[in-house]
């Protein structure tokens, strides 16, 4: 199945299940093989078998939800996700996918699912992705940037990460620094973390005389980290900012910001920069490859 040969996977799994008919992992693989082959009728038959099992795990409910979604059976899809979340209320993938279903229905309580996923299962990337995109289209200036950058670091090689980098650059340009007073429109925020973020960012606005570019963002974000750790880090410990400070201390924060923003602002300029700063760029890539970015529990500050 890993090689995309779903027909052969189905043949092998069907025969294996004749010998071990109650093997949960093989039943899940068979359902997913039919799903990836787009044989949704047979995928549904297998999904129902999974969901009828007393030992059905969270993945079984994901499979069922995905199959019903592919069949555009919205009510059944929602029923499956609700049943899964009743059994596994803190499962990040289920919260993420149920939120996506609500979003497709234009039910904006979807953000409640994604925020809960971030709070109870912070190591799962999908909720950061969905929440960042949600906040980008609201008046909020903070959380699309925070969640978006977390997502890019958790899922750095995916196509979604490339799209999120563009969203981040747009967020700094079109939202955070669009007004001279960056707190404008944020007066109703209940999050003390958000207020602290805006306080530190607002003090760097004088650096924007040349607009928002990768270079100015690097300067702003460098000074932000120094300000944050001077005033707020003790009150709001946060892995993302710990990581940024570590990059500063290692002398590769400039390369990180080029990787984060330069690739979408101007790819040719980014290539020129990497050649001119070959050692720093290679040090950053080597550093990045040796670490898995993961948010810990207990660092949730989105008071809505």
Language-model segment annotations:
Residues 2-3, 36-37, 70-71, 103-105, ...:
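Register position in tetratricopeptide repeats
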Residues 9, 43, 77, 110-111, ...:
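Single-residue signature of alpha-solenoid repeat helices
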Residues 26, 60, 94, 127, ...:
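TPR alpha-solenoid repeat register
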Residues 29-32, 62-63, 97, 130, ...:
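Canonical tetratricopeptide repeat
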Residues 6, 40, 74, 107-108, ...:
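TPR-repeat structural position
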Residues 123-304:
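Eukaryotic alpha-helical solenoid repeat scaffolds
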Residues 21, 55, 89, 122, ...:
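Short coil turns that delineate tetratricopeptide repeat
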Residues 15-16, 49-50, 83-84, 116-117, ...:
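Canonical positions in the second alpha-helix
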